[in-house]
Design a protein with these regions (language model features):
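C-terminal long alpha-helix characteristic of the crotonase
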Residues: 147-152, 203-252, 281-285
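CoA-thioester-processing core
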Residues: 113-119, 127, 133-187, 200, ...
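Glycine- (often His-adjacent) and acidic-residue-rich active-site loop
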Residues: 37, 69-113, 246
Length: 285
């Protein structure tokens, strides 16, 4: 970890465009603030996530982390308009090894952001309200504990935009909600409400509103922070030991798969439909 990440300077929110950070009483709180609509995950999100969570991991004053979204929604997921430039070269008809290798590097870089959350030795509690779509689900599956407000809605939406989810949902969800529920959500791209999310174990508890969900997340983080920090880290390490290799293998596989097979006419159609605000017409090409 680089020196500038391990110093308290990482806490200065003025250097970030996608996050706001506070630390008090051994609990860090990180809030998604955009700049895309609905806290969509654009270039700033992906470049800032790693140093922030490496900072939490290395900061002895931080014992637990709360993550939440600003405004009404947790996150709309990947900011396709903002990221479209990264997809362009690999979608070109003559795209060969060069653009595909660059695309593979981009996937690995984005995976590293979500992994920084999952690998943080300080337990992460996610408070979800409103929409949590695509990359938002990737992010909350990397958290250790999830709570939601009654208005929360979840969707593994990638299949509906011709993308195989590659940031961690397919690797982590089966251990959280089971294989059957994971397949249903990932293959249909359907939306589920907070009540079902609680029934299948995606969230631990559902609270009346956003304020109550955030208060519950803060209370849980405070309970964790009151325990011996090295023992908490030991519990985390033991719990994570068995899942690490399986998740890592899955992430490597999907990064390679998407680099080889994701570019398609259907993906181009999905991107065009997003910009033109219409329903895509997929042809399996």
């Amino acid at each position: 970890v680089s020196e500038d990440v391990t110093t308290p300077d990482y806490r200065n929110s003025d250097q970030y465009r996608a996050f706001d950070i506070t630390v008090a009483d051994h609990v860090a709180e990180v809030t998604l603030i955009g700049p895309g609509k609905g806290n969509a995950m654009g270039p700033d999100f992906w470049s800032e996530l790693v140093p922030i969570f490496e900072g939490f991991d290395a900061d002895p004053d931080v014992r637990a982390v709360v993550i939440a979204g600003s405004g009404k929604h947790f996150s709309y997921g990947l900011d396709l308009p903002a990221m479209s430039g990264d997809f362009g070269p690999v979608l070109a008809p003559d795209a060969k090894a060069g653009p595909r290798t660059t695309f593979h590097t981009m996937i690995k870089r984005m995976q590293a952001g979500i992994n920084a959350v999952a690998d943080c030795r300080k337990p992460v509690v996610a408070a979800i309200s409103g929409w949590c779509i695509g990359g938002g689900v990737d992010l909350i599956t990397a958290a250790d504990i999830r709570v939601a407000s009654a208005d929360a809605k979840f969707s593994v939406r990638e299949v509906r935009v011709a993308i195989v989810a590659d940031m961690g949902s397919l690797a982590r969800l089966p251990r959280i909600i089971g294989d059957g529920h994971t397949r249903e959500l990932a293959l249909t791209g359907k939306d589920i409400d907070a009540a079902r999310a609680e029934r299948i174990g995606l969230v631990n508890d559902v609270h009346d509103d956003q304020e109550a969900a955030l208060a519950a997340a803060r209370a849980t983080a405070a309970d964790i922070a009151a325990n011996p920090p090295l023992v908490v880290q030991g519990v985390m390490d033991v719990l994570d030991h068995s899942r690490r290799s399986a998740v890592d293998d899955s992430l490597r596989y999907v990064a390679a798969w998407n680099s080889a097979f994701l570019p398609s006419n259907d993906l181009g159609e999905a991107m065009a439909a997003v910009f033109e605000k219409r329903k895509p017409e997929f042809k399996g090409e």
